[in-house]
Swiss-Prot record:
Residues 2-142 form the Globin domain. It comes from Rattus norvegicus (Rat). The modification Phosphoserine is found at residues 4, 50, 103, 125, 132, 139. This is Hemoglobin subunit alpha-1/2. The modification Phosphothreonine is found at residues 9, 109, 135, 138.
Length: 142
């Protein structure tokens, strides 16, 4: 998916506003995903997925850190996410549909925390960005 100059600006602006809340938002998005799409819990059977779990907090931070890295390297998502793509494709074997579920939950979380900034243009830019990240993460599944 091609990100326009406006999309890239929106992505950078959004990630700038997230600041130190990335881990918190990542955890919240994961909890939303577990509640809305309970089958996603099967990929996390080795950890405690209950609300407030230290393990979900830690994974939420990993998600947020990976997305921050992607936002910082939006011109080269495949290069920035290559290791993570290998991990999800070859070791974790996460069903690609789960990236869509998490992307949706991330959008909801960001909209809840930044309603004034979550314009239709911002929504569209973030949706395209998350779809691009998902595409990169699933590119090595073939």
């Amino acid at each position: 998916m091609v990100l326009s100059a406006d999309d890239k600006t929106n992505i950078k602006n959004c990630w700038g506003k997230i600041g130190g809340h990335g881990g918190e938002y990542g955890e919240e998005a994961l909890q939303r995903m577990f509640a809305a799409f309970p089958t996603t819990k099967t990929y996390f059977s080795h950890i405690d997925v209950s609300p407030g779990s230290a393990q979900v907090k830690a994974h939420g931070k990993k998600v947020a850190d990976a997305l921050a890295k992607a936002a910082d390297h939006v011109e080269d998502l495949p290069g920035a996410l290559s290791t993570l793509s290998d991990l999800h494709a070859h070791k974790l074997r996460v069903d690609p549909v789960n990236f869509k579920f998490l992307s949706h939950c991330l959008l909801v979380t960001l909209a809840c925390h930044h309603p004034g900034d979550f314009t239709p243009a911002m929504h569209a830019s973030l949706d395209k960005f998350l779809a691009s990240v998902s595409t990169v993460l699933t590119s090595k599944y073939r």
